[in-house]
Design a protein with these regions (language model features):
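Short, positively biased Gly/Pro-containing turn/loop motifs at secondary-structure boundaries
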Residues: 10, 25-33, 70-102
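G2-box/ATP-lid motif of Bergerat-fold
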Residues: 38
């Protein structure tokens, strides 16, 4: 369900991108094999802002990259919860995580 006020990562989308950039650890085996891809992760932002029910919605094509995407999602700090009619609500969220070698 979509909430009147969607959940937000602390500091907004810019901080989320910064968090991902600083916390994704590109697996060595993936680097050695030049594996790239985009893993689309789905998760629920709970009423208290915690992250739950994380799963891969669309695979990057590489299990190692998918596992790293999930790890970084599950380790995110609490979000500001979504709101509906003045109450905190659970909101499902999808986020693409890109793995690209420089």
């Amino acid at each position: 369900p979509v909430a009147e006020q969607m959940p937000e990562f602390p500091g907004g989308m810019g901080e989320l991108m910064k968090y991902l950039g600083e916390n994704i650890q590109y697996p060595t085996k993936a680097q050695d094999n030049h594996w790239e891809g985009v893993a689309v992760c789905q998760f629920v932002v709970e009423k208290d802002g915690s992250i739950n029910e994380a799963k891969i919605l669309q695979s990057s094509g590489h299990e190692l990259l998918d596992a790293e995407a999930l790890r970084v999602i599950l380790n995110m700090p609490k979000w500001t919860a979504g709101m509906q009619n003045g109450d905190s609500v659970r909101v499902k969220f999808a986020l693409p995580i890109s793995f690209k070698l420089q």
